[in-house]
UniProtKB/Swiss-Prot annotation:
In response to TGF-beta, phosphorylated on the C-terminal SXS motif by TGF-beta and activin type 1 receptor kinases, phosphorylation declines progressively in a KMT5A-dependent manner. Phosphorylation in this motif is required for interaction with a number of proteins including SMURF2, SNON and SMAD4 in response to TGF-beta. Dephosphorylated in this motif by PPM1A leading to disruption of the SMAD2/3-SMAD4 complex, nuclear export and termination of the TGF-beta signaling. In response to decorin, the naturally occurring inhibitor of TGF-beta signaling, phosphorylated on Ser-240 by CaMK2. Acetylated on Lys-19 by coactivators in response to TGF-beta signaling, which increases transcriptional activity. SUPFAM superfamilies: SMAD MH1 domain (SSF56366), SMAD/FHA domain (SSF49879). Keywords: Acetylation, Cytoplasm, DNA-binding, Metal-binding, Nucleus, Phosphoprotein, Transcription, Transcription regulation, Ubl conjugation, Zinc. The modification N-acetylserine is found at S2. It holds the Pfam family MH2. This is Mothers against decapentaplegic homolog 2. Monomer; in the absence of TGF-beta. Heterodimer; in the presence of TGF-beta. Forms a heterodimer with co-SMAD, SMAD4, in the nucleus to form the transactivation complex SMAD2/SMAD4. Found in a complex with SMAD3 and TRIM33 upon addition of TGF-beta. Identified in a complex that contains at least ZNF451, SMAD2, SMAD3 and SMAD4. Interacts (via the MH2 domain) with ZFYVE9; may form trimers with the SMAD4 co-SMAD. Interacts with TAZ/WWRT1. Interacts with FOXH1. Interacts with SNW1. Interacts with CREB-binding protein (CBP) and EP300. Interacts with SNON. Interacts with ALK4/ACVR1B. Expressed in cardiomyocytes. Belongs to the dwarfin/SMAD family. It is found in: Cytoplasm; Nucleus. Residues 274-467 form the MH2 domain. One of its GO terms (molecular function) is R-SMAD binding. It comes from the Eukaryota.
């Protein structure tokens, strides 16, 4: 390998020898791409070695990597950019780009703790875990620190541990099967589904106290929001959300109301495409549905061709597009990143403008009205769906009958608008009044509902939760 660096120290060569490689790239241009990857990895390792030599932690890093031992000590670097990169405290937030990263050509550290090596950005523990352990790693949501790591990323200390063997991959929890009684009665018509599309939803801001780029969501919801008539809507919430908190709905604590019924276990299975995304401008569907197969993907406003990890809205045409929609599309920018990791879905705002999310599952978690729209500012992320919470609600709803289960269909649909919000606090009061928005259908939970509804007894007119 012809290095772009004038000299590669022996310790860097040794550490690069332990680098984990992804599957063979193959195809035209694979050699050039691999060469660029090798050069980037060399830069990342050389930069880290340079920093660790100053603190005497280099030997511990080499020991951890060569022995692959989690009982090694923490290998830390400062978590503030001014300490590690010598940047002046005069650097303001306005000087950082849309991901919170200052643009230096070699290696920089952002205000939110992200690291940039040769124009490629990421959190330092993610970069080095990807390099030495998991080449397919996408996000910090996929990692959790081992118990004896004193400087884990989640602890938000002045220093952060980059020892790749102090982190583990988050495993997707196995959802318990739902015991479904086979009912003999056949419904003559499908029960009405609660629809909040044309109602005026309440609004809430991103939960207070959550730091940007943090995967921590406080258990205590924000104070009760204000309804249209100016009164707090806590009473309305209590009436609407009478299913209790997710912690109270563990499937293991629920039992069928009639033990004499024929009970059949209905299991959850992961589909090939975990979600489907449709793009709308006002009330008009635009373009084809995007089917997500990768655990991490972005929906942005650029004109690059879409691929399995990227849904670009910039190329989509609409003859009915007006000036407001056109202007909004210009401000989508880097859009939103969606993660599906460990049975949880996260939305991270990458745009310079906020995104607005209506997630009944998230609203259930915080005790908000099911139709509440949450504003997510730039640089922040929010958990918008949790499979285990949904499984608990499904297990409880089965005991309440076909209609209660069917009502869970709306929990599997998430609406998200770019730049412009909607709801009681906005001029636009329905999602179809916003210039640019997307609708996510979570295929795994929807297909699980289908199987449960079929087991419970399908209506005479065939209609499923996917219809």
């Amino acid at each position: 390998m012809s290095s772009i660096l004038p000299f590669t120290p022996p310790v860097v060569k040794r550490l690069l020898g332990w680098k984990k490689s992804a599957g063979g790239s193959g195809g035209a241009g694979g050699g050039e791409q691999n060469g660029q990857e090798e050069k980037w990895c060399e830069k990342a390792v050389k930069s880290l070695v340079k920093k660790l030599k100053k603190t005497g932690r280099l030997d511990e890093l080499e020991k951890a990597i060569t022995t692959q031992n989690c009982n090694t000590k923490c290998v830390t670097i400062p978590s503030t950019c001014s300490e590690i990169w010598g940047l002046s405290t005069a650097n303001t937030v306005d000087q950082w780009d849309t991901t919170g990263l200052y643009s230096f050509s070699e290696q920089t550290r952002s205000l939110d703790g992200r690291l940039q090596v040769s124009h490629r950005k990421g959190l330092p523990h993610v970069i080095y875990c990807r390099l030495w352990r998991w080449p397919d790693l996408h996000s910090h949501h996929e990692l959790k620190a081992i118990e004896n790591c004193e400087y884990a990323f989640s602890l938000k200390k002045d220093e952060v541990c980059v020892n790749p063997y102090h982190y583990q991959r988050v495993e997707t929890p196995v959802l318990p099967p739902v015991l479904v009684p086979r009912h003999t009665e056949i419904l003559t018509e499908l029960p009405p589904l609660d629809d909040y599309t044309h109602s005026i939803p309440e609004n809430t801001n991103f939960p207070a106290g959550i730091e940007p780029q943090s995967n921590y969501i406080p258990e205590t919801p924000p104070p009760g929001y204000i309804s249209e008539d100016g009164e707090t809507s806590d009473q309305q919430l209590n009436q609407s959300m009478d299913t209790g908190s997710p912690a109270e709905l563990s499937p293991t604590t629920l039992s069928p109301v009639n033990h004499s019924l024929d009970l059949q276990p209905v299991t959850y299975s992961e589909p090939a495409f975990w979600c489907s995304i449709a793009y709308y401008e006002l009330n008009q569907r635009v373009g084809e549905t995007f089917h997500a197969s990768q655990p991490s993907l972005t929906v942005d406003g650029f004109t690059d061709p879409s691929n399995s990890e990227r849904f670009c809205l910039g190329l989509l045409s609409n003859v009915n597009r007006n000036a407001t929609v056109e202007m909004t599309r210009r401000h989508i920018g880097r859009g939103v990143r969606l993660y599906y990791i460990g049975g949880e879905v996260f939305a991270e705002c990458l745009s310079d403008s906020a995104i607005f999310v209506q997630s009944p599952n998230c609203n259930q978690r915080y005790g908000w009205h099911p139709a509440t729209v949450c504003k997510i500012p730039p640089g922040c992320n929010l958990k918008i769906f949790n499979n285990q919470e949904f499984a608990a609600l499904l297990a409880q709803s089965v005991n309440q009958g076909f209609e209660a289960v069917y009502q869970l269909t709306r929990m599997c649909t998430i609406r998200m608008s770019f730049v412009k919000g909607w709801g009681a606090e906005y001029r636009r009061q329905t999602v179809t009044s916003t210039p640019c928005w997307i609708e996510l259908h979570l295929n795994g939970p929807l297909q699980w509902l289908d199987k449960v509804l079929t087991q419970m007894g399908s209506p005479s007119v065939r209609c499923s939760s996917m219809s």
